[in-house]
Swiss-Prot record:
This is ATP-dependent protease subunit HslV. NCBIfam families: ATP_dep_HslV, PRK05456.1. It comes from the Bacteria. CDD domains: protease_HslV.
Length: 177
């Protein structure tokens, strides 16, 4: 059975970095949970993370990523690249189905199981089924308003929840400021 239902958005503006997700977990066409937490802080609260995909796979990747952060003393880029290398080459990790967004005060990165570590050109990134909708809304708000990162993230997530059936309007946020 396929699990769907995640939208994770990260916005950086001025000295604030915010990550937001919806709370819906769906199996097939059934909503199983409305308030799941798909985001967390790692490395003594200095790194934000969020996932789209299988929950068990995501937690495995969170643990691995946190280990890489410890090994590389909080160097987000190095930890992300090393995780992506492991994810791509390890026979067991290779089967994990998830995408991660990770961010610190300087960088926002998307990490995939294909070995990709992508730093968006803009200060906005999104993953998951509602990711394209949240990204478009956040980008429009970022480019055309002076709203703070948190307001942009919340408004964009609300818009995504009205378009994507796998995204709800119970929005959970974490912030670095």
């Amino acid at each position: 059975m396929d699990f769907h239902g995640t939208t994770v958005l990260c916005v950086k503006r001025n000295d604030s970095v915010i990550i937001a997700s919806d709370g819906q977990v769906t199996m097939g066409n059934t909503v199983l949970k409305h308030n799941a937490k798909k985001i967390r802080k790692l490395y003594n609260g200095q790194v934000l993370t969020g996932f789209a995909g299988s929950t068990a796979d995501a937690f495995t990747l969170f643990e691995r990523f946190e280990g890489k952060l410890e090994t590389y003393k909080g160097n987000l880029l190095r930890a992300a690249v090393e995780l992506a290398k492991d994810w791509r080459t390890d026979k067991i990790l290779r089967r994990l189905e998830a995408l991660l967004i990770v961010a610190d005060k300087e960088h926002i990165l998307i990490i995939s199981g294909n070995g990709d570590v992508i730093e968006p050109e803009d200060q906005v990134a999104a993953i998951g089924s509602g990711g394209p909708f949240a990204f478009a809304a956040a980008k429009a708000l970022y480019d055309n308003t002076e709203l703070p990162a948190k307001e942009i993230a919340i408004k964009a997530m609300e818009i995504a929840s009205k378009i994507c059936i796998y995204t709800n309007n119970i929005i959970i946020t974490e912030e670095l400021s």
